[in-house]
């Protein structure tokens, strides 16, 4: 430490604290007020490292590529983490531990039990608490010298610029397409580097947008994908450690930029496959001269309706499709009455096998949606056999098939396929259960597992 000490020109026995917060404590209410475009956050003017700083950061201070000057840059940097979930938790944790000066934590959501396997800064005692406040509360116990600003709000075209322009670096840890476009366009307008990551199932991706002359998100994706092809963690699942790994690498990119080093993934996409244990770097195309966002930032349509543009909600919650008419759907209450009245029918569970293994209604048959979409002869033949058994057992000619899934999305798709396969047959009726098995658990059987 002698070499490091010789570089320190001054020392202070105290560490910086937030004036409105006690040490190692965060208030859950009230939340910080949003600052307008003309009410900029105060500049972080730290001129030297304190003795407590030297002790706390000593293991990274001795790194030649960082050193005292790099640590000072970190202490004067402000980072906004958008999304305090599976990615945002490791990002915020390592940024706080490394000594970032100010950390904005933005999330509209509250902590739920299904978050805890991957969102490791929350806990069972935080259920129902604002995620941004929960993260700030945990991190203040880790490093009270960092300024934490939790925002319990949804980012939208009306508030995005006034928030983002007050930070040096933006970490996009969101889980929906409209927010990614909104954050990208706002970063272009504000001239901020954007460190963006995603994680789904066993895979993760990471890249840096809008850094120097590098591309932005719209350069790569001028148009959003069809909403029905987009899968998030709630729909597709994710192994908890995958966002932990990608989020840690995301924090590393932020730290490099904040300390004055060049990021590794500007113009490069990192792809991680947890099943194979493999990392791959893919060079991505450069900045587009005709990009709608970064070719002329002053004309970027920051106030556009991003949900309409993407055809999906700016939320990581499961989307709700509306493919069927009301007459083609049954509420869980209506289906319960149908059961109680012993109306002959086939209940077809169209979820993937791993979900069926979690829970199922005992009288249902299982035909996965994928098998129907592919018109797999095995599954079509199986269904025809069950329909024949229904007619024989009930001494009826009416063929009623009711589809069910987790939330009532795939079941609607299944009805459309059934109508295509069997719709021309006499007395064939296909309907789905609105809200699926989770609505059944919510409104009919509280002991039915929720996932």
Curated annotation (Swiss-Prot):
Residues 341-449 form the Rhodanese domain. It comes from the Eukaryota. One of its GO terms (molecular function) is URM1 activating enzyme activity. SMART domains: RHOD. Pathway: tRNA modification; 5-methoxycarbonylmethyl-2-thiouridine-tRNA biosynthesis; Cofactor biosynthesis; molybdopterin biosynthesis. Its main location: cytoplasm. Gene3D superfamilies: NAD(P)-binding Rossmann-like Domain (3.40.50.720), Rhodanese-like domain (3.40.250.10). The active site is at residues 233, 405. Binds 1 zinc ion per subunit. Its EC number is 2.7.7.80, 2.8.1.11. Zn(2+) binds at residues 216, 219, 291, 294. SUPFAM superfamilies: Activating enzymes of the ubiquitin-like proteins. InterPro entries: MOCS3/Uba4, Rhodanese-like_dom, Rhodanese-like_dom_sf, ThiF/MoeB/HesA, ThiF_NAD_FAD-bd, Ubiquitin-activating_enz. It catalyses: [molybdopterin-synthase sulfur-carrier protein]-C-terminal Gly-Gly + ATP + H(+) = [molybdopterin-synthase sulfur-carrier protein]-C-terminal Gly-Gly-AMP + diphosphate; [molybdopterin-synthase sulfur-carrier protein]-C-terminal Gly-Gly-AMP + S-sulfanyl-L-cysteinyl-[cysteine desulfurase] + AH2 = [molybdopterin-synthase sulfur-carrier protein]-C-terminal-Gly-aminoethanethioate + L-cysteinyl-[cysteine desulfurase] + A + AMP + 2 H(+). NCBIfam families: PRK05690.1. This is Adenylyltransferase and sulfurtransferase MOCS3. It comes from Xenopus laevis.
